[in-house]
């Protein structure tokens, strides 16, 4: 039986999960929920099902795999990664994955907070000012490695790709000063399963955020 991934019909938090499902050749189907237009941004399509799915902490995204029902995007990623040995093989690799997972969420939500804020135009310059320093840290962390944990890909690379790519959409050219990050971005998109997915009708690059965001990526 295929897994079911539930999320809004946007990129949001789901792209790393979608890409990991594709990369691992996992049989899955998507349940995409649509949010209504302004001014009410109706969420009834999700809310009508929210408490009927048997989820311990009902939220989007969710993943249903038989009797296993998960919410929280990183918990879902780790669940899938454990099935395929993509959590790091050595203690050093697992430490790097753990650090990245949490650091990326910090940086992800810094962008989210700017883009959903009614004070977007006031907050954007400060975000742009601090972005090069954040990217420099990722560049130093990667160094000359092909993947962020080491020689082999892990689920953390799916998170890094997503955060870097969202920032590329927000600030075109922001990776130009960091050749190893640009190379990583190209390397990731060049993975055969990822490349095929990105060419398919299932792939959602934008909108990055929901309609109620000030900046959605479109």
UniProtKB/Swiss-Prot annotation:
Residues forming coiled coils: none
Subunit and partners: Homodimer.
GO molecular function: glutathione transferase activity; identical protein binding
Reactions catalysed: RX + glutathione = an S-substituted glutathione + a halide anion + H(+)
Function: Conjugation of reduced glutathione to a wide number of exogenous and endogenous hydrophobic electrophiles.
Residue intervals of the GST N-terminal domain: 2-88
Annotated ranges, domain GST C-terminal: 90-208
GO CC, any one term: cytoplasm
Residues of the signal peptide: none
EC number: 2.5.1.18
Main location: cytoplasm
Upper taxonomic lineage: Eukaryota, Metazoa, Chordata, Craniata, Vertebrata
Example GO BP: glutathione metabolic process
Designated name of the protein: Glutathione S-transferase Mu 1
Pfam family name, one: GST_C
Gene3D superfamilies from the UniProt entry: 1.20.1050.10, Glutaredoxin
Keywords: Cytoplasm, Transferase
UniProt record similarity statement: Belongs to the GST superfamily. Mu family.
Tissue: Well expressed in rabbit liver, brain and kidney.
Naturally occurring in which organism (per UniProt): Oryctolagus cuniculus (Rabbit)
Binding site for glutathione: 7-8, 46-50, 59-60, 72-73
């Amino acid at each position: 039986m295929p897994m079911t991934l539930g999320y809004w019909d946007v990129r949001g938090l789901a792209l790393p999960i979608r890409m990991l499902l594709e990369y691992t050749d996992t049989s899955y189907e998507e349940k995409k929920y649509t949010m209504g237009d302004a001014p009410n941004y109706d969420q009834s399509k999700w809310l009508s099902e929210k408490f009927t799915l048997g989820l311990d902490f009902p939220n989007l995204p969710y993943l249903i795999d038989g009797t296993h029902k998960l919410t929280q995007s990183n918990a879902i990623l780790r669940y899938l990664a454990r099935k395929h040995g993509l959590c790091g093989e050595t203690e050093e690799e697992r430490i790097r994955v753990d650090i990245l997972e949490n650091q990326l969420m910090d940086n992800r939500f810094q962008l989210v907070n700017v883009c959903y804020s009614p004070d977007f135009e006031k907050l954007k310059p400060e975000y742009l000012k601090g972005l090069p320093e954040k990217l420099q840290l990722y560049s130093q962390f990667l160094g000359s490695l092909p993947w962020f944990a080491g020689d082999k890909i892990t689920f953390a690379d799916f998170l890094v790709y997503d955060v870097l790519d969202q920032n590329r959409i927000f600030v075109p050219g922001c990776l130009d000063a960091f050749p190893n990050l640009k190379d990583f971005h190209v390397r990731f998109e060049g993975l055969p399963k990822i490349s095929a997915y990105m060419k398919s009708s299932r792939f959602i690059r934008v909108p990055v955020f929901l309609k109620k965001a000030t900046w959605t990526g479109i």
